[in-house]
Amino acid sequence: MNFFDNTEVAFSLKSDSELERAYFLFKMIQNQPMVRIGTAVTNFALKAKLPVEGLIRSTVFDHFCGGVNEEDCLPVIDKMYEKGKVCSVLDYSVEGKEGEAIFDETMEKILKIIKFGSEKEAIPYAVFKPSGFGRFALYQKITAKKELSAAEKAEWERVKERFDKVCAVALEKNVPLLIDAEESWMQAAADDLLETLMETYNKDKAIVFNTLQMYRHDRMGSGNVPGNWQP
């Protein structure tokens, strides 16, 4: 059954005014010159510390984001679960930033999300991207099987420690953990690491899950899925 064949069901969580606002927003997004101008103006306003956050929050942000933190997301999470039994996954979106302090901060945020989700029936999973725990170029170099320098080896050990700590807490809190697949030219490094972690943490039940980029036809066969868990 395709629920979107019945718009009354598909959009039951939205009021008429919310649907009208969403329609207007998508019409605006289709206008590329308007998007370019709006992006430039918004970036300027934020850098100039102009009071535009309320406007952003009431338009683009609230349509595409649940909130600025876990607690801020709760009204949307509860509404979707209570009215439609729709579960939520909190996705910490800080892509593109690199640095050991940033990676540690991201790890702590994921740990907090796991603990937060363990108390909420409406949040059945936690998720993170490998590039949130380590440099993209490092994954890429390992995927290409290039030799690492001493500093890079130490850096990779820190990446593995972050993965391991998060997986351990996911097991402790009984929260399934999805590791979001990324670009093919860095994914093998993440796959190999995850296969080891799945062997460690999925002994009694599946807690750690690798994911696939479905546009990659070479990933579709079960034999090509790294770390398959067998009950």
What is the predicted role of each segment?
Residues 1-177, 188, 192, 196-202, ...:
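Alpha/beta catalytic barrel-like cores
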Residues 176-184, 209-214:
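Short, surface-exposed recognition loops or helix-turn segments adjacent to catalytic cores
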Residues 212-222:
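Short, conserved secondary-structure transition motifs
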Residues 224-231:
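Aromatic-lined glycan-binding groove of carbohydrate-active enzymes
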